[in-house]
Amino acid sequence: MKIGYKELHIPANADGSPKIDINSLHIWPRGNFMLMGLANLDNSFTCTLFMPIEGENSFESLKSEEQLISFFATYFPDTKEALPDLVRDFFRNPNSYLAIMKCFPWTFNDKVALIGDSSHAIVPFYGHGMNAGFEDITILNEMMQKYGDDWDQIFKAYEISRKPNADAIAELSRRNFEEMSAKTADTNFLLQKKIEKWFSDKHPEKWMPLYSRVTFSLQPYSEALAIGDFQNEIMQEVLKMDNIEDNWNSEEVENKILELLK
């Protein structure tokens, strides 16, 4: 991904209260770039500007104070009061870069095995980089219990098991950036998520939303990705239904999803 990021800061008010809602994840989606705000314990916010490195609307294009102020006035006008130190933070804080790294094999004979980011660095938009590394350790330990001192077999079984899941969480993380930066401003996408939540609440045994499946279950990432793609195909059919905007929580929609799940 040719995307970088830079951290900015929203301080608390003089009386210690937050400038924006403290109980929300704040996202300003703008297509191929976005601003995100996460609350801190002191009622301040750490904001992150994710943006292409080069091209129009990129870090490369914001070289002067005037360009920066004009850019924020155009795309994030409601942050003017919240970011009093925008210019200082932007030009003082470093640009960092996002990367997805895939490789194989992860092992060399019975001597060395790569684990975690050394074998599958991913972008942070699912928050699962560390969890994926812990899963590596879990599977490696299982193979050690299964194959004893046969490290060649341990390593082979470990990398074969983990590679598809590492690739899957890399893809899920990449897609989540696209969802946050662009689709959260799309009315059809928001309607889809509303229908999924409604149907899942009614039929939790039949439908777990993709994000919940990845984050709150022990299901392998590769299975979660495949099921999520299947669910998305169903939802694209549901969104084609007549008057879906008004009838999104109707019995007709419920029956349609149940039929497509068969």
Specify the residue positions occupied by each region the protein language model found:
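Conserved mid-domain beta->alpha element of the FAD-binding
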Residues: 8, 94-185
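Conserved short hydrophobic patches within well-ordered secondary structure
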Residues: 20, 67, 117, 122, ...
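A structural signal for well-ordered alpha-helical segments within the folded catalytic domains
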Residues: 66, 135-138, 193
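C-terminal helical "tail/cap" subdomain of flavin- and related membrane-associated enzymes
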Residues: 142-262
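Conserved FAD-binding catalytic core of PHBH/FMO-like flavoproteins
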Residues: 1-98, 102-108
